[in-house]
Amino acid sequence: MKYTILAALLAGLSITSIFAQQSVPELPLVSVPDPLKLPADIHLGEIAGVAVNSHGHIFVFSRGGSSMGPAYMETAAQLLEFDANGNFIREIGKNLNAWSYAHAVRIDPQDNIWVVDKGSNMILRFRPEGHVDWVFGRKGEASHIQVPPDYITIMARMLNQMGVDMEVPEELNPRWPVPVHSDNAFNQPTDVAWDSQGNSYFSDGYINSRVGKANHRGEWVMSWGSLGSGPGQFDTPHGIAVSPDDEVYVADRGNRRIQVFDTDGNYIREFTINVPVDTSRGKITYGRENPLGTTGSLAPGAPDALCMTPGPNPVLFVGDVYPSRIYKVSLEGEVLGVYGQPGRNLGEFGWIHAIACPSEEEIWVGELINWRVQKLVTHGTAQD
């Protein structure tokens, strides 16, 4: 039997008992100790991205580094490669002009390495040998301060995203800078994915609230979406993946949902992740507890990280900021199980920002608050 939070509360059940009685199983996992071997002079920061190529090599995009990034903090982007046994191989793109504030790394079917840098508004493709050959977007020529037209509405929007209900006048636009939809240009992009024809899809992102598309030659084709909560609208599209049937899945974090589109941007369906929070298990490592939150990026189930397993029968792995769990989800939106709980120990999570899933039995997780990458070994398939 399935319980909604509201129904359970009306029945006088505690949050703990809701978790115990709802139908989503808690799935077993093993977190492998020290999966990556770092040189003595390299240190991880916030882990914005993690990816695995066809040879089992692991790529980590960390908010740390040896170069001087121009935005947000002194060193805010470093791309590292490890072999299948976790041995350090190299740093890619050292002192690269685009490095500013790491957000995502992905590997395409040809083993090219794609990085999304939120701070420089750039998405780059590296060849497997480690040199850039495609560049999307352009970094600004100088740092400057943008003064929002209405500071009160900016703060109201931030509070809304944290789950605090605020009254914002309809005529005021609390998004700043104002979204500008230009070809080959981004404003705080977040992720990238590809379809079976080699087209690229970009989630763009914190400001522009849209999805961009380029063809197999790297030529800009189109974009869709705008700021809002209706079908085909977004509030911080934070992750993106494409199924074998070429359906585009977008993690619409601020609206706490995953939307699905065809490759022309036509809306197909959407679904939400509704798994009650057991507040007695694990202490959150960021923000504040809001187990009954239904809106905003910090609400339970708001998709922060998104990964689709390869092969003909894929599943989704979705991570949230609060309470920091991983959900195993069918492509139709059924939650098949949940992994982990908030915390700092192995098998616990603090702000899941990146997931790589070379199979259902092997999951790599990048965390912002805990400054680490975990390798999770699981058992079972979507049919179990």
Question: What residue ranges belong to the model's regions?
Answer:
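Bacterial N-terminal signal peptides
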Residues: 5-17
